[in-house]
Amino acid sequence: MKKKALALLCAAALTLGLTACGNPGGQSSNAGSPSGTNTVGSSAHTSGQNTDFPTKNINLIIPYSAGGDSDNMFRCLESSMSQFLNGNVIVGEIVSGGNAIPGTQQALDAEADGYSIVIAYPGNICIQPNMGNATYQYSDFQAIANITASPVLFAVQESAPYDDFTGWVEWVKAHPGEFTFCTGSLGGTPHLAMMKMLYALGIQDDVVYVPYSGNSEAYAAVAGGQIGGYAAVASGVVNKEFVKPIANLGTVECPAYPDLETLTDVGVDMSQATDVFCGFACSSNVDKETVNALSDAFAKAMELPEVQENFKNLNYTTNYLNAEDFQAYLDENYEAYAQVIQNLDLTQ
C-alpha cells in the first residue's frame, strides 16, 4: 500500500514538458558538451585573474562520503593542482551526512576569500535548496569550474525477460502495475531522472516507486530480486553483478556501456535527459578575480594527460566548464529541478 501511495503521489503531481537538466542551451560550443570528451580549450581560460592568489593552501569541503563520486573526482586532480596554485595545495575535508547540507553550509560559513570551496553536485547546490531542506539559498553560491558529467543509468534484474530499453517499455505497458523500481533516495537526481522519463513515455501509472536509503541498498534490492530495477549514477551500475543496464537516461555517453539505448531510442526527446555534473563552487561573495584564478588552475590541470588518464581509469567523463559557463549550466539545472520538484510535491 505504501508503495502504491508513493507511485500515486508522483503520478498526481508531475507533468510533461520538463526542462533539460543535461546539456544547457545557449552556451558556447565548449559548454555542457554531451560528446563525452574533455572540452578544455581556448574558452577554458578566464581573464581578470588575481595572479597573487593563492598564498596558502585551499580547503575543499567534500559534503559526501569518502570513496564516493565527488571524493574520487577530487582525487583524480589532487596531486596535480599545486603547480597551478603557486605551490600551494587543495586539502580535501570530508564533511558528510545530512543530505550534504552541513558540509555545504560549512564552506559558506568560512571567510569569503576563496580559500574555502565546496564540491558542487546537483544534490547540494540545486536540489536541496529547491526542496526547502537547506540552510542556505542557491544564490549564496557562485560557480568555479565543472569537471565531470555522468549520465543516470537504469538497470534491471539480470534475469529480466527483456534486454534493452525498448523491450522494457513494451513489457511495462503489457504488465501495468507489476514493475517496481528504486533509487538511493527520494528526490535525488536518479529518482527525478526516472520520473521525467516515465512521464515523457506516459507510463508513470504503470510502475511503482520504492525509495531506499543509499545506492548500495537500492542495488542490493534489485540484485536480490526484491525490486525490478534501479536508477543510479553510472558508477553505481558499472561492473555490478546480477543486474544489467538497459538505458542511459542522460546525454553523456557512458564509456563502460557506449551502446546503451537512450531516450531517443524509445521516442522521447533528449530534452528530458538528465546528466549529473560534479564541479566546484564557493560563496557568491568571493571576488571574481579570485574565482577566475581558481577556474584557470582547474582548466590547466584538466589538460594534463595523467589527469585525463586518472578520470578514464575510473570511468568518469571529463567535461570542463569555466566559471561563466558553469554558472549558466547551474542556473538552467536549478530551474529545471525546481519544476520537477514542484510537480512531484517534494518541497518541505
Positions of the model-derived regions?
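Hinge/capping helix and adjacent helix->loop/strand transition within the periplasmic-binding protein
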Residues: M81, Q106-Y115, N130-E217, L263, ...
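An extracytoplasmic/periplasmic, membrane-proximal ligand-sensing/linker region
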Residues: T55-N57, A200-D205, D265, K288-Q348
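Short beta-strand->loop
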Residues: S139-I147, V208-V210, G236, E241-A273
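Positively charged n-region of N-terminal signal peptides that target proteins for export
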Residues: M1-A5, L9-C10
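Short secondary-structure boundary segments
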Residues: Y121-P122, E158, V233-S235, G250, ...
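Stable alpha-helical elements in mature extracytoplasmic
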Residues: D69-M73, L77, N99-G103, G123, ...
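C-terminal motif of bacterial Sec signal peptides marking the signal peptidase cleavage site
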Residues: G17-A20
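N-terminal (or domain-start) structured segment
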Residues: G22-G26, G32-D140, E178, L186, ...
